[in-house]
Amino acid sequence: MKDMITIQNLTKTYGKHRGVEDVTFSVREGEIFGFLGPNGAGKSTTIRSMLGLIKYDQGEIRINGFDSVKDREKILADIGYMPSEAWFYPGMKIREILKYSAAVRKVDCTDEAEKLCDRLQVDVKRKINELSLGNRKKVSIICAMQHRPKLFVFDEPTSGLDPLMQNVFFELIQEYVNEGATCMLSTHVLSEVRNYCTRVAIMKEGKLFVTDTVDNLLSSRSKRIKMIRDGEKLDYIYKDNLNNLYKELEGHHIEDIIIEEPSIEEVFMHYYLKEEK
């Protein structure tokens, strides 16, 4: 399977301030790839570098085989990008926004836009400034999807959507992916990663911390330990071999102990905080 996105040694600084440093990873064609990290980790800088919205200092980015700098116009024609903030010209009707978005790409998106508006329950006759955050998000989603791109790049797409529309969004993504599209999903909602992504990259302080399959992250040797030891309640992630845990507990009074697989939220915190016990 070929790579849809290849990022090698990406570095970007903002004066004396850190952006990203020596970031390298790839996104395979046809997968839903999770891109995780807290605010300020470098996710947005990476995405904006991919799209040519900012100029990076070092490294190379290739999308579908094209250089992100030299072939930017070719790349953008086949990308559906949704930023985290849904900003539009106030006063425009939804129908006008969708037509304008299609015209910029020089593509007739009428049929696909109509289908998406129906699925996401969007009234094209309303003005954008009349809509709630969630409904503006829907319009942004449609703008990213209506030209049926080969690559979707979503930055916090479901924030503001109600649970029903969140499900519809991922149904649509899965349908496009089943037809050959690729999706890069930047999100804080770890349950979305667990349910929909095959692989994930975790960013921390401008650096790539880990890239792996979700299954591997969840099947790591780390365990969640809950116990009452010497009258004290403990709840933590244990990284070492369990035989060593048993040795550590010798000489202690253990009233109760539960050893279980950690959730993806706990795995993320384990990697991000380097929590050790």
Please describe what each predicted stretch is.
Residues 110-132:
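Conserved ABC nucleotide-binding domain
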Residues 59-70, 74-75:
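Conserved ABC transporter NBD signature motif
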Residues 238-277:
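C-terminal coupling/interaction segments
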Residues 141:
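Hydrophobic anchor residue at the start of the ABC signature
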Residues 152-156, 161:
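Catalytic Walker B motif of ABC-type/P-loop ATPase nucleotide-binding domains
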Residues 168-244:
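ABC transporter nucleotide-binding domain
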